[in-house]
C-alpha cells in the first residue's frame, strides 16, 4: 500500500473517531475519548494527519451545539492525559490552548468544566521548556478578559506551571508579576483571593534568601500601598549578599518605585539605599535592563528636587551604581536583548534549515521548537546535550533524522552567539573513571549557595575547591559526607577530615581515638600504632590524650584515621592550618601518592594547592565551574581570581589607625616592650614551656614567630600580650603602650552579642574608655598571690609604718613617674592587738614607680591606663566615628550601623574583630595564625595594611607567603627556646629618625567630650624682646602706667 493511501486511511480513521465522540451516548463518551487519544498519540505514517485532526477540533470548538463543544474538549483532555503524548501532537495542543481557555467563559456549565479540565491537562502534558509558548496566552487571558471565571482559570494555570516547570517559569516572572498584581485589584472577590494565592505561589520561585522572609509583606504591599513605608523600613535593615536575578527584581522593583514616590524623605533615602545595595549584586546588565526605566527617572527626579544634602548623596550613589551595572551612558538606557525571543529563534531555525523548506502545515511545530530554543537561550544553557535532548523529538516530525544533529548544533551555536556577553562557561573535559556526575542545589538555612549545578569527579584526582568566605565551601563538603547532595552515589565512601577534634574526646589517647571509631574496620591495635609511627608519631604522642596535642598533630591524627576507613573521596577543610613547613611537605607528598583516592581540598594556602591539585572547582554565581590544571593555571584562565594566588593582587586594602604618641619614645627603634630571661610553665606540667627567653618590640618591629607544632609560639604571644604572666623573668612595657591582640579563637567575644549591631558592640566594649573584653587578662586580674604580696609590703613614711590602700594619680618624676597613694597606718605592730587603720586623704604621699612595681604593679598599671584616658588619645564613641573607623577595614557604614552581628558572614566578623581591637589606636598589633580565619582577598588587604601601619607588628604563622615582604625579624621557637634573627635591638633611643609629635586637632575623652587645651605662649626672639623694652620705656617716659612684669 502506498504512503498516500495510508495517509488517507489515517485521516479517515481520525475523522470517524472524532465524529463518534461527538454523537456517542454519554456511557460511551469516555471510551470514545480514550480511543481518539490512543490513535492521535500512536504511530501515524504521515505527520500531516495530526494537523488535519486538530484543525477539525478547532472548528468543532466553535460548534453551535454545546454537546459537541463539550465532547471535543473532553477529547482534548484525553489526548493530553494520555500516558505518552507524541512529540508531534504536543505543539498542536499548545496551539489550541488560547481557544480552550476562551471556552471557560462558555454559558454552558458542562462546556466550562470541560474547558477547565482540558486547559490544565494541556499545560501539564507539555515539556517544561515550552513555558514561553504557554505563558503569553495565559497572561493575555488574565489581562484582557472580562469574564471572571476565565480569569480564575488562567490564574490557576499559572499555579499548575509552578508545579510542573518551576525553574523555567522563574525566568518569566518579570512578565507574570505585573499582570497578576493588576488582577489583585479586581472587583470580584473570588478573583482577588485567587490572585493573591497565585502571587504567593509564583513568588516561591524567587531564589533569594535575603528577601524570602519579606515576600508576604511585598505581596501585601501590592494590595495595600499604605504598607509601603513600613516594608521599606524592614528591607532597609537587611544586608544583601545573594546574587540578584530578574525574579528578585520583578517583585522588588514595584515596591521600590512606590518608595521613590513617597513623600517622606527618610523613606526615599532608604529606598535609594536598597536600590544601591541590590544593584551591586547584579552581575548581568541584561538582568537589570528591563527595570531601569522604572527606577532611574524617579532617582533623577529626587536628586534634582530633594533638599536634604545627605539624602541627595545617597540617591546619587544609587544612580551611579545603577548606571554602572546597567551600562547606562549619558542617561541613555540600553536596549534589552532579543536573543531569547521566540520570534528571533524561529528566524534562526529557518535560516539553519536552509534548503529544507518547512511545510506550511508544520509551521506550528517549528514555532514550538523556537519557543524551546528561546528558553534554553534565556537560561544561557550552552550544553549540547540539553539542546539535543529537548529539541530533537519535535524536529523528527518533519525532518530526516540524518540532518537533525547538524541542524540542532547550528541552531544552538547561532542562538547562543546572540546572547550579550556570551553563554556560561563550558566545562573542560577530564579523562578517567567517573566517581560521580550529579546535578543538585544546595542551601544553608534560608541562604541558597548553589542552584542547579553539576559536580563531576574522577577517581584518583585532586580538586581544589575555591570561592570567597561565606560561599559555602565547607557546607558543600558536609552535605556530601552527610548524604545531602541529590544524586551523589550512595555507595561511595567519603571522609571529612577536619582540623578540629571534638572536645568530648579530649582525654582519649591517640591510638584509642582511632580504635573506638565505629567506621574504622581494623581493630588491631598494633597495626594502628604502626601506621601512627609511619606518620612520625612517637610512643609518647601515641598514648597522649588528644586534647594535649597541638593543632598540627591533631590534623595528622585525623588524616591517619581517615585512611583506615578506606575512602573513595577525602574531603579536607583547611588541612595546612596549624601545620609547619615540614608537615605541609609531608601532607603534599601523602596526597600526591594516593592514586585511587580522590581529594577535594579547601585551603587558603595557594602554594599548597599549586603543588597538589590537578583541577580547581570554582564557585561562580551559584554554580560550580571546573578548570583543569593547578592554581597558577586557574589564575591564567580566571584573572579575576588572581587574589587567590597572589596576596598583593587583592584590590582591598585595610588601613589601621596611626598609634598615639608615647611619652619619652623619640624614635621607632626604642623598645616599648622588653622581656629579659623570661620562663613560663603551666601549673601541673613537668617542665617549663618557655625557657630563658629575651626579646624586645619597638614601633618599627615587623616580627614573624615561627616554629614546629607544639613549640610554644602561642604561649609566647600570650605572655607578650599579658594573657599569661611569666613564671620567671622581667617584662617591661611602656606605661601608655596599647596592644591589639587577635587570637585564633577570634569570634569568641562576638558570640555573646549576637543581637547588637557592630556599632553598638564597639560602643558597649569601650563605654568606659577601656576595653571591657580585656578586663580578664592575667596581667590585670589581682590574684591571691598578688593580694598576699601587697598585704605584706610595709612602707616607712614620716616615721610611721604604712600599707598601701589605693593608688590614685600619677605625675612626672625625672625620667619616670611617681604615684599618689592612700594608706593604712599600723598600730601595735607585732602584737596581738595589731590593727591597720585607714588614714585621711591629707596624709596621702607620692611614691616613686620603682618602689611600687615589685608588689603593686597591677595597681600601677590601672593608674597608667586611667592617665592615658585623660590624655585625650581616644576618639568620640559616636556612630559616625565608628563607621569611619570600620570603613578602613572594609566594613560598609550600612552594615556597621544597621546589621546585627549574628547576620554577618565569617569574613565580616573577622573585620569587625580587627576594627574593635584597633579602636584604641594600638602601638603593637599581634595576630595569631591570621591565615586560618581570613580568605585570600582579606589576607592581601591585611598584608598591605600591616606594611603601612605606624606601629609594631608580631605575627604567628606557618605561611611563608604571608610573611614574605612583610616581616624583617624572625623569632624561631623550638623546644621551649627562642632564637631571634634579623633583629635590630637597641638600648635607649637608637639612631633612627626622630618621631615628631604631631599637632593634634580636637581631642575627646572616652565619652565624646571635647578637651579644651591651653594654648602655649609663643617665645619671643631677642629682637622682639628689645623692641618691647623700648616701647615700655617710651610709655613710662610719657607718664603712662606701665606694669613691672610687662614684657
UniProtKB/Swiss-Prot annotation:
GO terms for molecular function: ATP binding; ATP hydrolysis activity; RNA binding; translation elongation factor activity. GO terms for biological process: cytoplasmic translation; cytoplasmic translational elongation. GO terms for cellular component: cytosol. Keywords: ATP-binding, Cytoplasm, Elongation factor, Hydrolase, Nucleotide-binding, Phosphoprotein, Protein biosynthesis, Repeat, RNA-binding. InterPro entries: AAA+_ATPase (IPR003593), ABC_transporter-like_ATP-bd (IPR003439), ABC_transporter-like_CS (IPR017871), ABCF_EF3_subfamily (IPR050611), ARM-like (IPR011989), ARM-type_fold (IPR016024), eEF3_ABC2_chromodomain-like (IPR015688), eEF3_chromodomain-like_sf (IPR047038). Residues 1026-1037 have a biased composition (Basic residues). PROSITE patterns: ABC_TRANSPORTER_1, ABC_TRANSPORTER_2. The modification Phosphoserine is found at residues 714, 768, 783, 1043. Residues 411-647, 673-1000 form the ABC transporter domain. ADP binds at residues 396, 401, 709, 929, 932, 958. It catalyses: ATP + H2O = ADP + phosphate + H(+). SMART domains: AAA, TOG. Monomer. This is Elongation factor 3.
Amino acid at each position: 500500500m502506498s504512503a498516500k493511501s495510508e495517509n488517507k486511511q489515517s485521516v479517515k480513521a481520525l475523522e470517524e473517531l472524532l465524529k463518534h465522540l461527538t454523537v456517542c451516548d454519554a456511557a460511551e463518551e469516555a471510551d470514545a475519548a480514550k480511543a481518539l487519544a490512543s490513535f492521535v498519540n500512536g504511530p501515524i505514517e504521515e505527520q500531516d494527519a495530526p494537523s488535519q485532526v486538530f484543525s477539525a477540533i478547532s472548528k468543532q470548538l466553535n460548534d453551535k451545539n454545546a454537546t459537541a463543544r463539550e465532547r471535543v474538549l473532553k477529547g482534548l483532555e484525553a489526548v493530553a492525559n494520555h500516558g505518552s503524548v507524541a512529540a508531534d501532537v504536543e505543539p498542536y495542543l499548545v496551539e489550541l490552548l488560547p481557544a480552550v481557555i476562551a471556552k471557560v467563559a462558555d454559558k454552558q456549565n458542562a462546556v466550562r468544566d470541560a474547558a477547565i479540565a482540558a486547559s490544565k491537562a494541556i499545560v501539564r502534558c507539555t515539556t517544561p521548556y515550552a513555558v514561553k509558548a504557554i505563558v503569553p496566552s495565559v497572561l493575555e487571558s488574565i489581562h484582557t478578559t472580562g469574564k471572571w471565571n476565565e480569569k480564575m482559570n488562567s490564574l490557576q494555570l499559572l499555579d499548575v506551571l509552578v508545579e510542573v516547570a518551576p525553574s523555567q517559569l522563574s525566568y518569566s516572572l518579570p512578565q507574570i508579576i505585573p499582570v497578576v498584581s493588576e488582577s489583585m485589584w479586581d472587583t470580584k472577590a473570588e478573583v482577588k483571593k485567587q490572585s493573591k494565592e497565585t502571587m504567593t505561589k509564583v513568588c516561591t520561585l524567587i531564589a533569594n534568601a535575603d528577601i524570602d522572609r519579606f515576600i508576604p509583606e511585598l505581596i501585601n504591599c501590592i494590595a495595600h500601598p499604605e504598607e509601603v513605608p513600613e516594608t521599606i523600613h524592614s528591607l532597609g535593615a537587611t544586608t544583601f549578599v545573594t546574587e540578584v536575578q530578574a525574579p528578585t527584581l520583578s517583585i522588588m522593583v514595584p515596591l521600590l518605585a512606590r518608595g521613590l514616590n513617597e513623600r517622606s524623605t527618610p523613606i526615599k533615602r532608604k529606598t535609594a539605599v536598597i536600590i544601591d545595595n541590590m544593584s551591586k549584586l547584579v552581575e548581568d546588565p541584561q538582568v537589570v535592563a528591563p527595570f531601569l526605566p522604572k527606577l532611574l527617572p524617579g532617582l533623577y527626579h529626587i536628586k534634582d528636587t530633594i533638599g536634604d544634602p545627605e539624602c541627595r548623596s545617597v540617591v546619587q550613589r544609587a544612580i551611579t551604581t545603577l548606571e554602572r551595572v546597567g551600562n547606562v551612558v549619558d542617561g541613555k538606557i540600553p536596549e534589552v536583548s532579543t536573543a531569547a525571543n521566540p520570534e528571533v529563534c524561529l528566524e534562526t531555525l529557518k535560516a539553519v534549515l536552509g534548503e529544507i523548506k518547512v511545510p506550511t502545515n508544520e509551521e506550528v511545530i517549528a514555532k514550538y521548537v523556537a519557543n524551546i530554543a528561546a528558553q534554553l537561550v534565556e537560561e544561557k544553557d550552552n550544553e549540547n546535550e540539553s539542546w539535543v535532548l529537548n529539541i530533537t523529538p519535535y524536529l523528527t516530525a518533519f525532518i530526516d533524522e540524518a540532518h537533525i544533529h547538524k541542524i540542532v548544533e547550528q541552531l544552538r551555536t547561532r542562538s547562543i552567539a546572540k546572547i550579550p556577553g556570551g553563554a556560561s562557561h563550558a566545562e573542560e573535559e577530564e579523562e578517567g573513571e567517573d566517581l560521580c556526575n550529579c546535578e543538585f542545589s544546595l542551601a544553608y538555612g534560608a541562604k541558597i549557595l548553589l542552584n542547579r549545578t553539576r559536580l563531576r569527579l574522577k577517581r584518583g584526582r585532586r580538586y581544589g575547591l575555591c570561592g570567597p568566605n561565606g560561599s559555602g565551601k565547607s557546607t558543600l563538603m558536609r552535605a556530601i559526607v552527610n548524604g545531602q547532595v541529590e544524586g551523589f552515589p550512595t555507595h561511595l565512601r567519603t571522609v571529612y577530615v577536619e582540623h578540629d577534634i571534638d572536645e568530648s574526646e579530649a582525654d582519649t589517647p591517640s591510638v584509642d581515638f582511632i580504635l573506638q571509631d565505629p567506621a574504622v574496620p581494623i581493630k588491631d591495635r598494633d597495626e594502628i600504632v604502626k601506621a601512627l609511627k609511619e606518620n612520625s608519631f612517637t610512643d609518647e604522642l601515641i598514648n597522649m590524650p588528644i586534647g594535649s596535642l597541638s593543632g598540627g598533630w591533631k590534623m595528622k591524627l585525623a588524616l591517619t584515621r581517615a585512611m583506615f576507613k578506606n575512602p573513595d573521596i577525602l574531603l579536607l577543610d583547611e588541612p595546612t592550618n596549624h601545620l609547619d613547613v615540614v608537615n605541609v611537605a609531608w601532607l603534599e607528598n601523602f596526597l600526591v601518592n594516593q592514586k585511587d583516592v580522590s581529594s577535594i581540598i579547601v585551603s587558603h594556602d595557594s602554594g599548597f594547592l599549586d603543588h597538589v591539585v590537578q583541577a580547581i572547582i570554582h564557585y561562580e554565581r551559584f554554580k560550580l565551574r571546573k578548570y583543569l590544571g593547578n592554581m597558577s593555571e586557574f589564575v591564567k584562565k580566571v584573572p579575576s581570581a588572581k587574589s587567590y594566588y597572589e596576596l598583593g593582587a587583592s584590590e582591598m586594602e585595610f588601613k589601621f589607625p596611626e598609634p598615639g604618641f608615647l611619652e619619652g619614645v623619640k624614635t621607632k627603634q626604642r623598645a616599648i616592650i622588653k622581656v629579659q630571661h623570661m620562663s613560663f610553665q603551666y601549673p601541673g606540667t613537668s617542665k617549663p614551656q618557655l625557657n630563658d627567653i629575651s626579646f624586645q618590640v619597638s614601633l618599627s618591629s615587623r616580627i614573624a614567630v615561627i616554629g614546629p607544632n607544639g613549640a610554644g609560639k602561642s604561649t609566647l604571644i600570650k605572655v607578650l600580650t599579658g594573657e599569661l604572666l611569666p613564671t620567671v623573668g622581667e617584662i617591661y612595657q611602656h606605661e601608655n603602650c596599647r596592644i591589639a591582640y587577635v587570637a585564633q579563637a577570634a569570634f569568641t567575644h562576638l558570640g555573646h552579642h549576637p543581637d547588637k549591631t557592630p556599632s553598638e558592640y564597639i560602643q558597649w566594649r569601650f563605654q568606659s574608655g577601656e576595653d571591657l573584653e580585656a578586663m580578664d587578662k592575667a596581667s590585670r586580674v589581682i590574684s591571691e598571690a598578688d593580694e598576699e604580696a601587697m598585704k605584706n609590703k610595709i612602707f616607712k613614711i614620716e616615721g610611721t609604718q604604712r600599707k598601701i590602700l589605693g593608688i590614685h594619680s600619677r605625675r612626672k618624676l625625672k625620667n619616670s613617674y611617681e604615684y599618689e597613694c592612700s594608706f593604712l597606718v599600723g598600730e601595735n605592730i607585732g602584737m596581738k592587738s595589731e590593727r591597720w587603720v585607714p588614714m585621711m586623704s591629707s596624709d596621702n604621699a607620692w611614691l616613686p614607680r620603682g618602689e611600687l612595681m615589685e608588689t603593686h604593679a597591677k595597681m600601677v598599671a590601672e593608674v597608667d591606663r586611667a592617665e592615658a584616658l585623660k590624655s585625650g588619645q581616644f576618639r568620640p564613641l559616636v556612630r559616625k566615628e565608628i563607621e569611619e573607623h570600620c570603613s578602613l577595614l572594609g566594613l560598609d557604614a550600612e552594615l556597621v550601623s544597621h546589621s546585627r552581628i549574628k547576620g554577618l558572614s565569617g569574613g565580616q566578623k573577622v573585620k569587625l574583630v580587627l576594627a574593635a581591637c584597633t579602636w584604641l589606636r594600638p602601638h603593637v598589633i599581634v595576630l595569631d595564625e591570621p591565615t586560618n580565619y581570613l580568605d585570600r582577598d582579606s589576607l592581601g588587604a591585611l598584608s598591605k595594611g600591616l606594611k603601612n601601619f605606624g606601629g609594631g607588628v608580631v605575627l604567628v604563622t606557618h605561611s611563608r607567603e604571608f610573611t614574605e615582604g612583610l616581616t624583617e625579624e624572625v623569632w624561631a621557637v623550638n623546644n621551649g627556646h627562642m632564637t631571634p634573627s634579623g633583629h635590630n635591638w637597641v638600648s635607649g633611643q637608637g639612631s633612627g629618625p626622630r618621631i615628631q609629635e604631631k599637632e593634634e586637632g580636637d581631642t575627646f575623652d572616652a565619652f565624646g567630650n571635647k578637651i579644651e587645651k591651653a594654648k602655649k605662649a609663643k617665645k619671643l626672639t631677642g629682637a622682639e624682646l628689645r623692641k618691647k623694652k623700648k616701647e615700655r620705656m617710651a610709655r613710662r617716659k610719657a607718664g603712662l602706667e606701665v606694669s613691672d612684669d610687662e614684657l
